[in-house]
UniProtKB/Swiss-Prot annotation:
The keyword Ribosomal protein does not apply. CDD domains: MnmA_TRMU-like. Its main location: cytoplasm. ATP binds at A7, M8, S9, G10, G11, V12, D13, S14, L33, G125. The record marks H126, Q352 as: Interaction with tRNA. Its EC number is 2.8.1.13. Catalyzes the 2-thiolation of uridine at the wobble position (U34) of tRNA, leading to the formation of s(2)U34. The gene is mnmA. Residues 163-165 are annotated as: Interaction with tRNA. The active site is at C101 (nucleophile), C213 (cysteine persulfide intermediate). Disulfide bonds join C101-C213. It is found in: Cytoplasm. Keywords: ATP-binding, Cytoplasm, Disulfide bond, Nucleotide-binding, RNA-binding, Transferase, tRNA processing, tRNA-binding. This is tRNA-specific 2-thiouridylase MnmA.
Amino acid sequence: MAKIMIAMSGGVDSSLAAALLHEAGHDVTGVTLHLWEGDDDRLAESLCCSQEMTESARRVCAQLGIPYYVFNYQREFRRSVIEYFLREYASGFTPNPCLECNREIKFRALLARARALGFDYVATGHYARIRVDKTPADHSASPSPNGAQRAVYRLLRAVDEEKDQSYMLYMLGQDDLARLMFPIGEYTKAEVRALAAARGLASANRPESQDICFVPGGDYRNLLREERPDALRPGPILDLEGREVGRHQGLPLYTIGQRRGLGIATGQPMYVMALDVARNAVIVGPESALRRTTLRAERVTFVSGSWPEAPFDCLAQIRAHADAVPARVTPVEPERVEVRFEHPQRAITPGQAIVFYDGAVVLGGGRIARD
């Protein structure tokens, strides 16, 4: 029996994860991370920090007969996630705040707190899997000096490919995976709902939220206007030859691949190609120019903890819901790689993550850099 802290959002995924661990005989404690203090009009009931979702998690824990606590991480969330989100947009990147929340709050901070409180593991309702290989399959882990086999932890895609969240977890390393559990990674979403309903869990039919928790409705522009009005400086919209074809209302309001809302008339459809921070300019061009075969990535980490010594072939995924496609990754220097795709990719976006896979196994990933 293990002592397990499970992070609970109030939704069906983490609720079933808690139930499965409890039924397996583990000593389970549910916790909800209070990250964002939105007012009632701004914070939808379906979002993770709402009072309704907190009460949902509390009801499930009461139903299971396990302890439940709420941890306040508002200060850490603002510093590590909201400020990052605003800073990235102001710098001409398109950020992924949920990925940063996973990195800094849901795993780094929560794992540290769980360890301090004497828990063996942290579990979540993420759709991903962890596999433990006793015999190393690569050179990243060698047998221990006494000849005993060493455990090597692999992060894998979930069984449900549509719900798979491994892209958002690429930053996890060996020490993290050794203390994490993803109980629902072997199930499809339909199976999760059915299993939750069979147990009578209060959250079995709760709808999913697709919004960023601190940007209900998905419109981040109001947050930028409130907190970083200095970043919304009007400037030129330039074509690929440098000709001004219009004016923009601030770089953070645009993203790579955008067509609508540009307010320009050039005789052909034009798309955002790049955000030129130095000139405070939005660069536009035809759809064909959006496709590229190469990119550079920075802040790259590998699940194995070892840096590759040579180029390697893999499947690379450049956004959360994109397909992973064949590519070759060439290490350049610590934490930086160059990636060449077998076929051109559309709208490669600086600030988003690129994640490397070997089949279903996550190798690592990093942030797409600006050219």
